[in-house]
Amino acid sequence: MLLTVALVGCQSEETQSNTGLTAQAKADAVVAQKRQLAESFSQNYAAYAHTLKTQISADNLSISVSELVESAPNTEMSQQLRSADKNVRTLKGIDQFTEQLLQLRLADASMLKEWQEGQSPLFAFEPSGNDDSWQYIEAYDVYGQIHQLDVYQLPDVPVFVVDNDSAVELKAGLQAMRAEMQRLGQSPQLSTQESSSIEASTRSLSRSASADTAPISTTVLKKIRLQDDKEPWISGRAEIYALVTGVDPSRDKPTIDLIDMPYLDYDKQDYFPNQVVIHWTRYRWGAADMILMEQDDGTDYKELAKQLVKVAEEVLKLIPDPEVQGYAIIAQITGKIIEAIPDGVLVNDDDFVDVFYTLMQDTQYTDHPGANGNATATFEPLTIYPTK
């Protein structure tokens, strides 16, 4: 499962790739690729059964397509796997940032014993569109027959899911978004934004700091908890990231930073990441908002980056003198991002998790609820001395 925002709008030139496909059409093409692979795996299960049983375990419920190709590199099925993986990466705009993406994943650890004891599995894929509209999950048995599974009730038979490796996808997706945002004029994101801990942030800053580098003001995410993660069983673990939004201190341009949260997998569980999430030299008025997102399987990351920048810049263009309104502008930017990104960019519109409005520099927030009440977090100010 992966976090993102629900967005409304019409299809336009901005939601089309260089190939002319709309984002919805690209998402449908991704699903079609996975459907074909699920059917092919069902028909070729005997050829891969040994490899799967030696690689799949309680500690590792998935195997990458590249590993399956290595087990039989010269077969027609391996050629299909290579081609599908390349196509999906291209459709999602991340081909330049990862060499492999697809995997075969056992849907739940509870299925492992029965499968290892000889129960034939089904092979499924995630449908297209918003999961609220899904009527069933399609899965193929080893005879090529289609079964219709309940969307939310975990099946009582082993099911392998043809899926994206969500961690690989999110990492590559954020890289693609950062590159596209920088191309569109956003100032480069500082290294602390990409670090998972205070220690890593400090080491990264120290490597490039001179002896007279000034202390750096940041805000650290000390604790976070999600209340409800209503995802179908086929979607697997959540992959959460955040958008930190604000205004550039030196020009009338928005600042949008992307924060990876690879640890935040499940709801109703406390996490203590000690992660630097805001670097205050990038934000005017010492104020910023933070939107929590769930990665969407249908996301085209380059198009999403374009839309984020476009929407934020349009808000600022409507305000002649930002200093008059001050940091109240930030909530307008955040609100437009949540409301205005077209449904064609994020085809599964259940992805907005929560938002923290008006986080202030040098301010501590303890068990601070998000505006939707779905997330609770503790933030603390931290001054980093890079040369120490």
Where in the sequence are the language-model features?
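A eukaryote-biased signal for long
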Residues: 314-388
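Bacterial signal peptide processing site
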Residues: 11-14
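Long, charge-dense tracts
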Residues: 20-215
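Calcium-regulated, polybasic anionic-phospholipid
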Residues: 225-263
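Eukaryotic beta-sheet cores, primarily in C2 and C2-like/PH beta-sandwich modules
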Residues: 242, 272-314
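Polybasic, proline/glycine-rich intrinsically disordered low-complexity segments
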Residues: 261-291, 327, 331-334, 338-341
